[in-house]
Amino acid sequence: TDLQKNNHGYALPKIFGADIDKVNELRKAGLGLLGSIVGDNKAADSIEDTAVELSDLPNYIAEFSAMMERHGQSAIYYAHAGAGELHLRPVLNLKTKEGLHQFRNIATEVAILVKKYRGSLSGEHGDGIVRGEFLPFMIGDKNYELLKRIKKAFDPNTILNVGKIVNASKMDENLRVEAGRVEPEIATIQDFSDSLGILRAAEKCNGS
């Protein structure tokens, strides 16, 4: 293959028959595997949906990796790079003020980087709540005002998807974790020690 001829990749097996389904299932299991990280450091979702032109992806990822190194943080890279969208999740502890600070700083720097490459912050999943704050920066104030006018025309009483896309809250508001909060130790009949307790076991849920 072209990849092999150009010395790209470290494993290039040929997959046939039922093994193809196994490979696809591994890809589908990616999000669940990320959620199974034990402890308070989690693969945070905020920049996981960025997409750039495929030809720009190597440089974009190189700059992103250098940025993460400057922050002294690691990230998880997975999914469909062939579409120009390699899912990126910084591993952060959002239960600390430092983690929340890095959460915002990394997201802001990534927005600037994505715009540099004329990419999108929401290539697949949508802007929603966590990326809505950056929409004016990404598309420009005039385009954003147009979106607000369209929203007002179809939803004059603001009852549909409040705070999503337009008039979104800050990305670090209303999180389900709180920096410095003392968490109770809950006694359980079943053993959740492999997750460091039932609360952290519940935190493995990604909401999907």
Model-predicted regions and their roles:
Residues 1-79, 84-123, 127-208:
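Noncatalytic alpha-helical scaffold of FAD-dependent oxidoreductases
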